[in-house]
Curated annotation (Swiss-Prot):
Function: One of the components of the core complex of photosystem II (PSII), required for its stability and/or assembly. PSII is a light-driven water:plastoquinone oxidoreductase that uses light energy to abstract electrons from H(2)O, generating O(2) and a proton gradient subsequently used for ATP formation. It consists of a core antenna complex that captures photons, and an electron transfer chain that converts photonic excitation into a charge separation.
InterPro entries: PSII_PsbI (IPR003686), PSII_PsbI_sf (IPR037271)
Organism: Gracilaria tenuistipitata var. liui (Red alga)
Domain of life according to the entry: Eukaryota
PANTHER family: PHOTOSYSTEM II REACTION CENTER PROTEIN I (PTHR35772:SF1)
Name of the protein described by the UniProt record: Photosystem II reaction center protein I
GO biological process: photosynthesis
Membrane topology, record value: Single-pass membrane protein
One Pfam family recorded for the sequence: PsbI
Cystines in this chain: none
Subunit note: PSII is composed of 1 copy each of membrane proteins PsbA, PsbB, PsbC, PsbD, PsbE, PsbF, PsbH, PsbI, PsbJ, PsbK, PsbL, PsbM, PsbT, PsbX, PsbY, PsbZ, Psb30/Ycf12, at least 3 peripheral proteins of the oxygen-evolving complex and a large number of cofactors. It forms dimeric complexes.
């Protein structure tokens, strides 16, 4: 149960940080030339 909780927290933090930094560095509205992530 403890391992599952650690896995869930790690996954959530990973995706949140990935989305957060991705949104800051590659904002579609500020960088219309970037078509890597729609």
């Amino acid at each position: 149960m403890f391992t599952l909780k650690i896995f869930v927290y790690t996954t959530v933090i990973f995706f949140v940080s990935l989305f957060f930094f991705g949104f800051l560095s590659n904002d579609p509205s500020r960088n219309p030339n970037r078509k890597d992530l729609e």
